[in-house]
A protein has these predicted regions:
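Radical SAM enzyme core and accessory elements
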Residues: 1-28, 34, 54-61, 76-80, ...
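N-terminal [4Fe-4S]-dependent radical SAM core
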Residues: 2-23, 160-163, 167-207
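Radical SAM [4Fe-4S] cluster-binding motif and immediate context
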Residues: 21, 187-350, 361
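Glycine- and acidic-residue-enriched helix-capping/strand-helix junction motifs
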Residues: 32-45
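Hydrophobic positions in alpha-helices of CheY-like receiver
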Residues: 49, 102-103, 107, 274, ...
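Proline-centered flexible-loop/turn and helix-kink motifs
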Residues: 54, 108-109, 133, 312, ...
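Glycine-rich beta-alpha loop elements in corrinoid/cobalamin-binding modules
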Residues: 58-175
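Conserved C-terminal portion of the radical SAM core fold
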Residues: 83-85, 240, 245-257, 281-283, ...
Length: 677
């Protein structure tokens, strides 16, 4: 296929007079059970194009192709394709090019068009057309008008070089200005574009735009740029009708495609209408996933409160990315001040609104120390069960992929299989890849591994909760930093490889090393819990749950090590009480039952206060604890892992919520004693 040569004007636009040329629109997505996204990106392109009579009279969209299947099988079902249009991103690039390659082999005169964020900008194309000779046209930036003009030229003279916003066989045309009036583009939802898909046996999710553009220019992101920093709006009347459509079609999950929802005053009103539609429709859509703006704190709080009261939002994401000033300067990002962020988190927790704090590991400018200090600051700000740490990957059109930027910051990447969680392993016919940052001028690969291990420990044992109560205990009563606690845990694990913890540590460390040195996959499989892929921390959590008794039996050894390294003596009765409570509060997959026991201090209220940012002194005395298990998993590991980890992680469901603490009259005066100097 490397020698494909097709002369201009030789794309067949018809075989029979007065017949229509067949167009196929591809936007591949992952199937989660029976759930999949409607192809909004390419759907809105066709919704606009078909309003032009000359296109509608001469071109027929035969089908939207969205399922990831064997590429040969996909192409074998096509009927004389004359145009194949692909909407691409990091999760479907390899699938798209595999299908496009076969289409061109079997139908050499088919016009193949690629667009979407994964298509390199014109100034970054390089040898793109040599590498992908089966692609005829690439669309850069916003695609609706460019796509329609391509179809018009296909019908007529095929003078594609005259169309702004594309590259054609190495020739790049002038940049197309962004469309200011987005309402000229019909909604693919409201115009019936997706009607054919509802005949298929799937539950659909939807992407929803209320505006386009991002005023920020973070170097790791391809959302904002010099040409996309102004925000343009869709009309509110259209938006309300689309939300009513989602309710009518029983769309369970809506993902908002806005970069900064909450940045505009009108967004509060839009949120109110979403909540009202959900209330009046019997609960649809069930959830709305929002990318909130990072600076409009009061407005965002209003919106989150509205959605939370209707049980619509999965929680608010605080995308800090880094807490280090130098790193933020390097990636051209500004954050809320720490005091404001801390108050923000506590405000949401007080109102019962879940927060998720996101950090990116591997950003240029970050060091091991700054990464560690950032994690410490976030945990001190009470982001205890909400910390999500993502690996930095380089996107084709992000400023971080600029050659000068990569050279300046000595960015080294590794191509590794895309880290996609909660999908059935081995079922996907084509592997997708990420360009993962593993080294920068300020962080060598060995320090990157240390950061990965600290991230793993913090997320497994703190965010997911296996040792969170104990870490809070040592922090508040001994002054031991959270990150020190987890660094010591990693040391202990390495020194004790035959323990449950040690084995899990070695397994994780090997996985990290294989991924960053050999480009192996990051995903994990735990056969006892669902046939699906899990992140590092989720897999460790599940494996430890299989050996929970042994894991907690080993904690005396770890606390002896911690006592020696940090110079504290832990009063054994208090430590035993915290261990008992920590083990009991974790949701388990065994038969549901009520657990009751007595302890010598008010651990439950102490822990609950800490989770919402209230630092109160631990009260001593005798307390009766009653923990009720409402789940009754009865050993059903599949249901357990789905409800508690897959669905429930964002809601902090790894801990039982029905915990009653009742004081008993007898006093308990044991105190924590500092180690002798």
């Amino acid at each position: 296929m490397d020698n494909i040569e097709i002369e201009q004007a030789e794309f067949e636009n018809t075989d029979v007079p007065n017949s229509k040329s067949n167009l196929y629109c591809f936007q591949f997505s992952y199937l989660y059970g029976d759930e999949i996204y409607l192809p909004y990106s390419i759907g809105i392109l066709w919704a606009y194009a078909r309003t032009i009579p000359e296109i509608n009279n001469n071109i027929k969209n035969k089908s939207f192709v969205i399922l990831r299947e064997n590429p040969n099988d996909i192409v074998s079902r096509l009927e004389e394709p004359k145009i194949a249009a692909f909407s691409t991103y990091v999760w479907n690039w390899e699938m798209s090019v595999s299908v496009a390659r076969i289409i061109k082999e079997r139908y050499p005169k088919c016009l193949v068009i690629f667009g979407g964020p994964q298509v390199p900008n014109a100034d970054r194309l390089g040898d793109f057309f040599e590498k992908y000779p089966f692609i005829d046209i690439t669309v850069h930036g916003e695609g609706e008008i460019t796509f329609s003009e391509i179809l018009l030229e296909y019908v007529n003279d095929q003078k594609f070089q005259a169309i702004p916003g594309l590259s054609y066989r190495g020739f790049t045309t002038e940049l197309r200005p962004r469309t200011r009036d987005l309402n000229i583009f019909p909604s693919p939802y409201l115009t019936g574009v997706f009607d054919e898909l509802f005949a298929l046996p799937y539950q659909y999710h939807a992407v929803w735009e209320t505006n386009r553009g991002c005023p920020y220019g973070c170097t790791f992101c391809d959302w904002g740029s010099l040409i996309a920093q102004k925000i343009f709006l869709f009309d509110e009347e259209r938006l309300i009708k689309e939300m009513e459509y989602f309710a009518h079609k029983k769309i369970a999950h809506v993902y908002m495609g806005d970069a900064n929802f909450g940045i505009l005053d009108r967004d509060v009103g839009i949120a109110s209408r979403i909540a009202l539609i959900n209330k009046n429709s019997g609960g649809f859509p069930k959830k709305v996933r929002v990318n909130y703006t990072k600076n409009s704190t009061d407005r965002v709080f209003q919106i989150a409160n509205i959605l939370n009261k209707q049980n619509l939002d999965k929680g608010i994401t605080l995308s800090v990315q880094s807490m280090d000033p130098e790193t933020l300067l390097t990636i051209k990002r500004s954050n809320l001040k720490y005091e404001t962020l801390s108050a923000f988190i506590k405000r949401y927790q007080k109102e019962g609104i879940d927060t998720y704090t996101e950090v990116i590991l591997g950003l240029p400018g970050e060091t091991y120390k700054s990464f560690r200090d950032g994690i410490e600051a976030l945990l001190e700000a009470s982001a205890h069960d909400s910390l999500w740490i993502y690996r930095c990957s380089v996107l084709p059109n992000a400023p971080m992929n600029d050659l000068d930027y990569k050279t300046k910051h000595k960015i080294k990447t590794v191509k590794s299989p895309a880290d996609l969680h909660h999908i059935e392993p081995g079922k996907d016919p084509i592997q997708e890849y990420d360009e993962m940052v593993v080294e920068t001028a300020t962080m060598q690969t060995k320090d990157y591994v240390r950061c990965q291990l600290l991230a793993w420990a913090t997320q497994t044992f703190h965010a997911l909760g296996l040792l969170r109560v104990l870490a809070i205990f040592t922090n508040q009563l001994n002054g031991i930093q959270y990150t020190t606690f987890y660094e010591r845990l990693l040391e202990y694990a390495e020194q004790n490889p035959n323990t449950v913890l040690g084995k899990e540590y070695l397994k994780t460390k090997e996985k990290i090393n294989q991924a960053i040195t050999k480009g192996k996959s990051w995903f994990n499989i735990v056969p006892e819990f669902n046939n699906q892929t899990w992140s590092l921390e989720e897999a460790s959590y599940l494996r430890i749950m299989l050996q929970l008794q042994a894991f907690f039996a080993e904690q005396d050894g770890f606390f002896n090590y911690l006592s020696k390294t940090e110079g504290f003596v832990f009063e054994q009765k208090i430590l035993a009480d915290f261990l008992k409570y920590q083990k009991a509060i974790i949701v388990k997959y065994e038969n549901g039952k009520t657990e009751e026991f007595q302890i010598g201090c008010a651990i439950n209220s102490f822990h609950r206060n800490m989770m919402i940012g209230k630092k109160k002194k631990l009260q001593y005395g005798n307390y009766h604890i009653t923990i009720t298990d409402p789940y009754n998993f009865n050993g059903d590991k599949n249901r357990y892992s789905t409800e508690i980890l897959f669905w429930g992680r964002r809601g902090g469901k790894t801990f039982y919520q029905m915990c009653k603490e009742t004081p008993i009259e007898q006093e308990h005066t044991d105190q924590l004693k500092p180690a002798p100097k």
